[in-house]
């Protein structure tokens, strides 16, 4: 894949054969063919546009309760941590929550604005996106 991607345009970190045990709460599992941690949303966009169409993409957040088989993950794994971490309130009663936001942070944000319905997230480890 590195041959097909202009890595000079990437600002994030692209790793080959990255052990998923470093990215899950279970601390087990084989390697991802490629693991990408984008620098920001623009960098993520550049990376995704460079990934070959036939290559599978797997998204991970904190990896809480994510069990990866010993054979690893084919294709590319993209971490949303630190990238898709937006929290916005609009129309006084709606929230936009990015996939990289910790569940407990989302629940607290809603409570701060007097919104209900996601209180259960306070007890769930990990991020909205996994």
Task: Tell where the protein language model's regions lie, with residue ranges.
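Anion-binding (especially nucleotide phosphate/pyrophosphate-binding) glycine-rich loop
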Residues: 2-128
């Amino acid at each position: 894949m590195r041959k097909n991607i202009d890595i000079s345009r990437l600002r994030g970190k692209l790793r080959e054969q990255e052990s998923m045990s470093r990215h899950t709460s279970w601390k087990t599992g084989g390697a991802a063919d490629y693991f990408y941690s984008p620098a920001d949303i623009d960098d993520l966009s550049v990376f995704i546009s460079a990934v070959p169409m036939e290559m599978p993409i797997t998204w991970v957040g904190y990896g809480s309760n994510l069990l990866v088989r010993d054979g690893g993950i084919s294709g590319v794994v993209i971490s949303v941590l630190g990238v898709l971490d937006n929290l916005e309130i609009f129309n006084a009663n709606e929230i936009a929550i990015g996939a990289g936001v910790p569940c407990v942070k989302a629940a607290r944000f809603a409570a701060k604005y007097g919104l209900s319905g996601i209180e259960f997230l306070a007890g769930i480890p990990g991020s909205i996106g996994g």
